């Protein structure tokens, strides 16, 4: 429910804890998957030959000066020189979150 989301979280100003609560809420409601939640929480997968490495990546709160909406818009607009299924998946996830955040902002 967008009205609930808009009343609980400000898309243009979220602390780290608020962002994590927001992402967890989306997962708990089935809006995003566990894998999508991990990605939004900053977990990234990098391949090196046959091995997979996971590492923490700064979230929109750290990069976007707490303006999650603007940072996710930026993420959704990226054009990768070497597109992969994973980078396109991340970009599409960002677009999905942008649409949620924009609707929240309209209802504030």
PLM-predicted stretches and their roles:
Residues 1-108:
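Type III/flagellar secretion export determinants
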């Amino acid at each position: 429910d967008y009205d609930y989301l808009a009343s609980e979280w400000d898309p243009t100003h979220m602390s780290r804890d608020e962002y994590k609560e927001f992402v967890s809420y989306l997962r708990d409601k089935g809006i995003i998957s566990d894998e999508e939640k991990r990605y939004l929480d900053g977990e990234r997968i990098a391949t090196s030959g046959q091995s997979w490495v996971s590492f923490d990546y700064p979230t929109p709160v750290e990069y976007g000066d707490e303006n999650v909406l603007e940072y996710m818009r930026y993420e959704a607009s990226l054009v990768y020189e070497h597109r992969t299924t994973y980078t396109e998946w991340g970009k599409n996830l960002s677009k999905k979150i942008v649409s949620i955040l924009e609707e929240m902002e309209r209802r504030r």
